Each structure stands twice: as structure tokens, then as C-alpha cells.
UniProtKB/Swiss-Prot annotation:
Chemical reaction(s) catalysed: ATP + H2O + a folded polypeptide = ADP + phosphate + an unfolded polypeptide
Swiss-Prot/TrEMBL keywords: ATP-binding, Chaperone, Cytoplasm, Isomerase, Nucleotide-binding
Function of the molecule: Together with its co-chaperonin GroES, plays an essential role in assisting protein folding. The GroEL-GroES system forms a nano-cage that allows encapsulation of the non-native substrate proteins and provides a physical environment optimized to promote and accelerate protein folding.
Gene that this polypeptide is encoded by: groEL1
GO MF annotation list: ATP binding; ATP-dependent protein folding chaperone; isomerase activity; unfolded protein binding
Name of this protein: Chaperonin GroEL 1
GO CC entries: cytoplasm
Amino acid sequence: MSKQIEFNETARRAMEIGVDKLADAVKVTLGPRGRHVVLAKSWGGPTVTNDGVTIAREIDLEDPFENLGAQLVKSVATKTNDVAGDGTTTATVLAQAIIKGGLRNVAAGANPIALGAGISKAADAVSEALLAGATPVTDKKSIAQVATVSSRDEEVGELVGEAMTRVGHDGVVTVEESSTLLTELEITEGVGFDKGFLSAYFVTDFDSQEAVLEDALVLLHREKISSLPDLLPLLEKVAEAGKPLLIIAEDVEGEALSTLVVNAIRKTLKAVAVKAPFFGDRRKAFLDDLAVVTGGQVVNPDVGLVLRDVGLDVLGTARRVVVDKDSTVIVDGGGTQEAIEGRKAQLRAEIEASDSDWDREKLEERLAKLAGGVAVIKVGAATETDLKKRKEAVEDAVHAAKAAVEEGIVVGGGAALVQAGAGLAKLRSELSGDEALGVEVFTAALSSPLYWIATNAGLDGAVVVNKVSELPAGQGFNAATLEYGDLIADGVIDPVKVTRSAVVNAASVARMILTTETAVVEKPEESEDDGHGHGHGHHHGHAH
């Protein structure tokens, strides 16, 4: 495959055009008065969204050099989404502003390496300043405010606040589609843990990259499962029962895993294999907890329960299981209420009796998982398109609320970034030459999210940025009411984790593009067989 190569300014200029195309598509959605973007799908109806990462994922450009720039900025959105679950539009807008400011200076002769170093130092300083100035979030009202800002919907904010408060810090909040028009909250018995599927072939919902099993059977196994003859008799019984299967074991590998994958691809048996969390005695104890929740037994050769001989009676059940690459949630296990309450009482007694802080902490974690349950937010809407958009908004709101509980909140509406920029003057004075210039480029870029929030609200962005930079900390511009004031009191707040991720990821990608000297892409094939193409088309003409 032959390649095309571009150098220096030409390469960077083409990448900048790609960056602009992607960022310009995303930034119209920023802020409470942001607009929507309509995405045509190759199948089904169009999707209407204002979620930055959803838009970014859909964009691939025709020009391969421009596409390099677009894909690099897309990685800012996806990485911010993976870490914080929100803030993708802010990250994209920041990256664009840093890249544009940086490239202007590189074109004028600045050293890209020194410029990049200055940008990184400024990003780290802002990230630390944001964390230091964050307000912890503990009460339901603050959580609801964060979720409201993320979803632009007070009802969703209230539901997420209620859900997070009910299941506690260690509880699990999941989002499902409802068959009714209402969006409502259900608290169910259930448990979640931080281990995902062992193969991406188990995914059943490609949009969310999750494996979802409804009315599932659950096999809990204390040891590794690698031999197919051991697993096959049980798989045949499960296939006859016509139900999906969740396998949680120390590990699933070799023939056993490849058979499950082949069945998943052929859709002959819906099964998902997951590694049991923790190690040693903690893993054994957690599997026993899961057995109580699902109403099953742990297959354990030590007590005479051998995988080859077990029937369906040993398996647990669950109304719904959701597995992604990092986590598993079991909702409405088949265990009886008495058994679960008994297990909780036993754990409480062990906590009382324990004289080791470490053991007590681990027992409390297990109790929280059992007692917390799972909050399910069922999202309803009038049309399929509306439902998708609303479900996306609720998922973002849940991520934002979790991030807020983790690291606290800062003022929203782009004000925290503008005000953090004011603190960079000291850093700039400590640096010299192009590094100091990098800090300047970064400081100027920090106002871009606020600029676009104001512009999308129909105001002059530059005027609003100027005014906010003169306001005391905690004050800013509320684009929903078009007024200046105390943003925390108004509930215009962002999780600091989201804002920090946006800053750090944007700076990292901008630095990559600024220091690019050569771009290599594959040469498009069409030009080579143009002649054949025409002949082929001509031939078809005759066939008709």
C-alpha cells in the first residue's frame, strides 16, 4: 500500500482544518442554550443529540490528513468520557483553542517542544488549582444540581440525586429504557463489582458496548474453568432451557472460553464470562455473597460439587445482568429476602467481632455492596429518537454525579477555567522564552468554553469573558438566565473531575499536534483503478 507524506507547516495546517471541522460540529452544543446536532445513521432513523462524544464518534473526514487531526481531537472527547463520563464538549473546545493558538506561534517561529512544555506545565497547575478549590459534595441537593446541569433537565437531576442518596456511595446506579412514557426510579436488590467481560465478542448492545442478559442463569465457580468436557454438559442444559448464562469464576480460559465466544458469535447460546473480583479468601467470601444474592450455590470441588456433574438447580438467577469492559451489575437476583438479610446480619456480627481495621474495612465494603442494592432509572419518552437522546442525557448525569461525589465540585459555566487562568501569571513569570509563551497560549484558551457558552446563548462571547474575568471566585455567567451572579447558589456547578480531565486531555493532544513535523497516510486506491471502474460500470449498463 503506497503512502502519502506531508511535512512541516503543510502537515500541521491540514490537521488543523480537521480539528476545526470536528470541534466546530461539537461546540454548538455547549451550554444550557446549546443547539442540537442531527446524525444520519446507516440504518434506522437519524439521532438528535447534544452529547459531544456521540457527535465526535460519528465524524470521519474524507481528506486523510485532515482526518488525522479530527481523530486526535476525537480521542480527547473519548478519553475524557472514559475517565469522567462527561465534559467531552468542553475538552474538545479547549483542545481546539490550544491548537489554534499554538500553531499560530509555531508558524511565527516559536519552538514547538518548548511551547508544548509550557502548555503541559500550565495544564498541571490549573488541574491542581481546580482540585484545591473544589467543594465536597455529600447532600442530595448538590448531587441533584450536578445532574441537572449535565442533563439540562430538573426532573432527571432530582431522580439521579434520589438514586445516589438511596444506594449510597458504594451503590450502583444503572439506566434502562422503559416501555412507558414516564421516567422513574426503582431501587432493587442487586450487586455490582469491578470486573468486566473476558471477551468483547460477548457484547450484545453495540451502541453502549455492554452485554445485557435478561432473565439470566448465573454459574458461580470457585476455580478456573478451562476444560470444555467439564463445562459442556451444563452448557447443553442451559441451551435447552433457552436462557442466557452469566459465568463468574476465578478465570475462564482455553477451550471453555473459545467455545463460549463461538456460541456468542453464532448466537446459539447467549453467555458472558467474567472473572471473580478480589483474591484468596476475599474472593471466596464474595462468591458466597453472590450465591446468596442470586439464590445459587458456588461450584466447589472441595465440597464435592464438580462442574461436570452439576445441573440447573445449582445455578442462581437474575432478572437482568449488565456487563461492560470494566464492571458487572446483577439486578434482582433470585435469592430470598430472608437469606440476604441473614447474610447481612452475619456480616454485621463479623464487623463487631473483628479487631483488625483492614478486615473491618473489607467486611464493611461487602456489607455496603449487599445492603446498597441497585438503583435503576427507567427512561421513557414518546418516540424512539427522543428516548435515545433522553437515555444519553440520563447516563451523562449519572456519570457527572458520581464524579462529583468522588472529587467535589467547582463553579460551572466555564467560569472556573477563566478564574483558574488568572492564577497562571506566577507560573508565567517563572518561565522564559517559548515555555512562557506556551503558558500564555494555554491561558488564552481557558476562556474558550465560556466564550462558546455565551455565543450559543446569543451574546457576544468576548464581552462575557471579559466581565467574568473581573468577577470574584464563585461568581460567573449563568447562560440559562442570562445573568451574572453566584453560580454555586444558582446550582451552576461542574464536577471537578470532569473539568480537570478536560484540561489535562486537551493539553496532551494539543501538544502532540503542535510537535508534529510529518504526517503519513495511506494513498487512496480509487486513482489506480479508475479505468477498470468505468469498464465495470459500462458492463453493468449492458447487463440491464
